[in-house]
Amino acid sequence: MGPWGEPELLVWRPEAVASEPPVPVGLEVKLGALVLLLVLTLLCSLVPICVLRRPGANHEGSASRQKALSLVSCFAGGVFLATCLLDLLPDYLAAIDEALAALHVTLQFPLQEFILAMGFFLVLVMEQITLAYKEQSGPSPLEETRALLGTVNGGPQHWHDGPGVPQASGAPATPSALRACVLVFSLALHSVFEGLAVGLQRDRARAMELCLALLLHKGILAVSLSLRLLQSHLRAQVVAGCGILFSCMTPLGIGLGAALAESAGPLHQLAQSVLEGMAAGTFLYITFLEILPQELASSEQRILKVILLLAGFALLTGLLFIQI
């Protein structure tokens, strides 16, 4: 009998629970997700390269191929827009609020928005420094000296045709290549944090839900990223390398999260949130000043492009809704 007369079987003893050997819940799920995400994302990254850059295909000279790539890129633009507004930003804001609450920090200053702005200005400053350096080094084409809020270079030739406007010869312009690199970096960094979320999970069911959602999400993002890099006129080898890098980031995050699951604290979470906020700010810049202006700059097939943009947005919205 217990001290208050209850039967001994109904008395809960914490020491009895603590004496049980710890079981790594969901570890096999995390390892399986690591392999599946690596393989699936890599395959999805290479599919656009194999289809659009086949040996012997005159990609640059084919107007129909350029139009098809432009339409598919509009769909990818919708995916990136949904990723920015419905995935990166909410994840970042929730993570940093949780970290600050765990540290018992109350702010009067909008720190979350300030970190976003710093990521935004980071890309802006990098681009302007690059443009200033090229302008001082020698004469540059008209496209490279235009304001970044105007027509965006690096797109297909027929997008900016007009009297008296010199056209690019197929080589990527510096701002477009730089933006492509920043896009890869921001997505890669966010992928590491998404992998960390899976690796830090201790519940088997929740880990499986996150893994399935990431499999669909990363597959679509991998295809969209490769299309965007091809649209920037980067070499196929460079696009493939970026795809491999992007494919490795989420598995890397899963591995790190599984290793750090027992030692993660509020300070670690705050540092992670700051980095994720910087990445979200850079992605915000790329989405609204690179991807959307470039896809909607052409006067051809405007309605179809808007429909595809909305379709891409709706697809990722549906995936995120299922994930919730």
Swiss-Prot record:
One of its GO terms (molecular function) is inorganic cation transmembrane transporter activity. It catalyses: Zn(2+)(in) = Zn(2+)(out). GO terms for biological process: embryonic cranial skeleton morphogenesis; in utero embryonic development; limb development; monoatomic cation transport; zinc ion transmembrane transport. It is a multi-pass membrane protein. Inhibited by Ni(2+) ions. Fe(2+) ions do not inhibit zinc uptake. Inhibited by Ni(2+) ions. Fe(2+) ions do not inhibit zinc uptake. It holds the Pfam family Zip. Keywords: Cell membrane, Endoplasmic reticulum, Ion transport, Membrane, Transmembrane, Transmembrane helix, Transport, Zinc, Zinc transport. The keyword Signal does not apply. The lineage of its organism: Eukaryota, Metazoa, Chordata, Craniata, Vertebrata. Residues 1-30, 90-104, 201-206, 259-272 are extracellular. The chain crosses the membrane at residues 31-51, 69-89, 105-125, 180-200, 207-227, 238-258, 273-293, 304-324. This is Zinc transporter ZIP1. Induction: Down-regulated in prostate cancer. Belongs to the ZIP transporter (TC 2.A.5) family. Ubiquitous. Expressed in most adult and fetal tissues including the epidermis. It is found in: Cell membrane; Endoplasmic reticulum membrane. GO terms for cellular component: endoplasmic reticulum membrane; membrane; plasma membrane. Transporter for the divalent cation Zn(2+). Mediates the influx of Zn(2+) into cells from extracellular space. Functions as the major importer of zinc from circulating blood plasma into prostate cells. Residues 52-68, 126-179, 228-237, 294-303 are cytoplasmic.
